Design a protein with these regions (language model features):
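Cleavable N-terminal export/targeting peptides
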Residues: 1-32
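Outer-membrane pore/translocation modules
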Residues: 96-210
């Protein structure tokens, strides 16, 4: 039973960590409009320590510990697409992940470090966020905004099928979403309040080299 428990946890982690490593932060104001030809370079540091065997944090286990440390670099550029604002984004991650399973008999540890998968994303405004010059944007008052989001994760990260944990997923993933924003009250710098909703769906490709621990 102890051996079977370890296999179940490691199989869960094999799926979990590449998803975490290729994550993009969909935080507040991420999809606000901006002037055309604007370039934005963002850096993040993300660290997690816990005892959950699922990325949702819904299955804590006192026999398990995980540590994730990631550096995230994102580049954004705003374009004019037929009069609509379009934001192209590229995201790269690098860092290390580790997990330890403890039983009354022994402990088993696994770790991995390196580059994560490359994430590319395009967001095209459907209404409410026209393509604007810097001068026009200075007079812009945002109201209701709806956009179409399409993203792709490419299998560029470090991956070996002999490792229980990997920074890369060794498969293509795709995402589609509809970012929506509604300004509440006046558009006054420093006092802006918005309601932001982002429904999205992920589609996962196959990992043809997914043979670690006897998995297919």
């Amino acid at each position: 039973m102890k051996i079977q428990f370890k296999k179940i946890v490691w199989r869960t982690l094999i799926v979990m960590f590449p998803i975490v490593a290729s994550a993009i932060d969909d935080g507040p104001r991420m999809y606000w409009n901006g002037p055309v030809d604007t370039n934005i370079l963002q850096t993040y540091y993300w660290t997690v320590h816990g005892n959950n065997v699922t990325p949702e944090g819904t299955q804590p286990n006192n026999n398990f510990e995980t540590d994730i440390s990631l550096g995230i670099l994102a580049y954004n550029r705003i374009f004019d697409l037929a009069g609509h604002a379009m934001i192209l984004t590229g995201v790269m991650t690098a860092g290390n992940i580790s997990g330890t399973i403890s039983t009354p008999i022994n402990s088993t540890a696994r770790s991995s470090r390196g580059l994560g998968d490359l994430y590319l994303q395009g967001v095209v405004n459907l209404f409410g966020a026209p393509a604007l010059s810097a001068e026009e944007f200075a007079r812009y008052k945002q109201g209701a905004v709806l956009s179409l989001l399409v993203g792709v994760t490419a299998p560029t990260g470090d991956y070996e099928n002999s490792r229980a944990l990997n920074m890369g997923a060794n498969r293509w993933n795709a995402r589609i979403g509809l970012p929506f924003m509604q300004t509440l009250g006046d558009w006054i710098p420093g006092e802006i309040t918005t309601l932001e909703i982002l429904p999205s769906v992920w589609f996962y490709g196959n990992n043809d080299d997914y043979t670690s621990l006897g998995l297919n």
